[in-house]
Swiss-Prot record:
Residues 1-23, 454-489 are annotated as: Disordered. Acts as a regulatory subunit of the 26 proteasome which is involved in the ATP-dependent degradation of ubiquitinated proteins. Keywords: Nucleus, Proteasome. GO terms for cellular component: nucleus; proteasome regulatory particle, lid subcomplex. It comes from the Eukaryota. The 26S proteasome is composed of a core protease, known as the 20S proteasome, capped at one or both ends by the 19S regulatory complex (RC). The RC is composed of at least 18 different subunits in two subcomplexes, the base and the lid, which form the portions proximal and distal to the 20S proteolytic core, respectively. Pfam families: PCI (PF01399), Rpn3_C (PF08375). This is Probable 26S proteasome non-ATPase regulatory subunit 3.
Amino acid sequence: MTQDVEMKEVPAPAPSNSVTAATPSTLQHLKEIASLIESGAYAREVRRILRAVRLTIALRKKLNASVVNAFLNFSLVPGSEVHARLASYLPKEDEHDMEVDTAMSATTTLAKHSLPELEIYCYLLVLIFLIDQKKYSEAKACSSASIARVKNLNRRTVEVLASRLYFYYSLSYELTGDLAEIRGNLLALHRIATLRHDELGQETLLNLLLRNYLHYNLYDQAEKLRSKAPRFEAHSNQQFCRYLFYLGKIRTIQLEYTDAKESXLQAARKAPVAALGFRVQCNKWAVIVRLLLGEIPERTVFMQKGMEKALRPYFXLTNAVRIGDLELFRXVADKFASTFTADRTHNLIVRLRHNVIRTGLRNISISYSRISLVDVARKLRLDSPNPVADAESIVSKAIRDGAIDATIDHANGWMVSKETGDIYSTNEPQAAFNSRIAFCLNMHNEAVRALRFPANSHKDKESAEKRRERQQQEQELAKHIAEEDDDEF
């Protein structure tokens, strides 16, 4: 980001009206978005509202107080209750900006319609601007007022805008540390969305509730809500990715590592390329889960573009687990303790200590056909008061779980390893190929389900028999008309 700033050229001094020249372009875009929302509301076309929201997100970096205020004057009736409320959240402008807004409002006027969609869009625009300007107290007040207004509206075209309002409503309270205050309100909104069959709203609110619970480590409540909430086909890819990520976190805490790994990897794979921060979080949890499963992630996972720095602590952790060095594992855990605490993965890393010991024991079992338990304790660097007894207990448990193929000679205090057999004579290669084939088939099915088809296309298709009958009738009719013409002639 710093590099981009340095590469920019210094603009030449512009005349005094250059400030006003940049403002109408942004305002003009907002006016086009307003007309798009208006046409979508009249035609009841939800796709146009979705497109308007996407265009707004692209414009958010260009917003300023004068542009937002001018758009409010353009789309709402000046002096109305909604206009006065939204204008009160915006910062006061200087006289120059006020003159610019007045001039633009005078040149182009909109026939003011009491469209609920346009009113909700104004709430959304002001809320986005306040959050970007870090005016969180005003954003909380604006979001609360917008939610109170949305509760009284039951229109399909409003649901798209309402889902975005729900997100920023939760975000504004999260940024001020008051996320617990709105949990009851989010549950009430989810109930209203369910009664109105608003599937997009249900999807968004379920994710916000899961995020709310997980923020306070209420994993049991989150799982109860998730299991009882209605599920249906995803309407938003972003919301589906968030759901998979939260599901992966819940499954990880519940020790269901296989399901957690699948959810976290699927969320990272489905996430948009621009959502780098989200994909980084998904990869962090996926790495931890794979380590807990006894797998070692590939080096390419940590070398993904834009993720090298964020995943460096987890790379060093993976290296310690791969080697089975307990001392190196402790050093990495202590060095990056603040990072792991911020990522909320510190408790999971504590669980990895057992995996490190088991990996080291497996390496010892492969390297030595017979080794004393004293040497095993020394190589594992066990720091307990009675390391030999602990080593014997660890080896016994590993043999029972099938992690190593060995026996214990209690009389002499040895661990005797058995010869390793041919892995290709077992079912492991078949299971590995089966998992890869299932993964490819699932990806193909998801890609097919994600395709868009024209509405009622199956009704427009004409069977071959009907086509032949129609053509035959047309030929007979043409022949009959020709015969009548001959008779008249």
